[in-house]
């Protein structure tokens, strides 16, 4: 089961979104502030995908995204926010986001976008693994 970290401060949205994502077989953990998200992200490898709101009480999802990208270029990041201004969309994508979805949104579309990003992430991991190791022996799978 894929694990998602959701950074969102709107409690009513959190409840419905967590319920729906779990029904779609995603494991979801929630952070309500940037500070709380930083604690979760100290173990970034636990997550397969991040969903970030932009406007939070103690910072922005853009800042979280930029911090994550310094450590991990591969993890898919989706911005899910009410801010539909072009400047916000551009900043989200330029800061390292893979997708930008505005509220209100369709849950089916969000789940499809999540699955698409997770498929690409798995493929990218496979591409990255070009050698095998067993003890002292390393095999170059590409023969280069």
Each language-model region and where it sits:
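N-terminal/domain-start alpha-helical segments
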Residues: 1-123
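Short, Lys/Arg-enriched segments at the junction into DNA-binding effector domains
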Residues: 116-144
């Amino acid at each position: 089961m894929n694990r998602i970290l959701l950074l969102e401060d709107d409690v009513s949205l959190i409840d419905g979104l967590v319920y729906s994502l779990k029904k779609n077989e995603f494991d979801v953990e929630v952070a309500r502030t940037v500070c709380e998200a930083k604690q979760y992200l100290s173990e970034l490898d636990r997550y397969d995908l991040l969903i970030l709101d932009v406007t939070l009480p103690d910072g922005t999802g853009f800042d979280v995204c930029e911090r994550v990208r310094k450590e991990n270029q591969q993890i898919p990041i989706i911005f899910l926010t009410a801010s539909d201004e072009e400047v916000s969309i551009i900043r989200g994508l330029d800061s390292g986001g893979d997708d930008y979805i505005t509220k209100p949104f369709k849950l089916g579309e969000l789940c499809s976008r999540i699955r698409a990003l997770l498929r690409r992430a798995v493929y990218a991991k496979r591409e990255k693994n070009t050698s095998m190791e067993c003890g002292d022996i390393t095999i170059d799978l590409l023969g280069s």
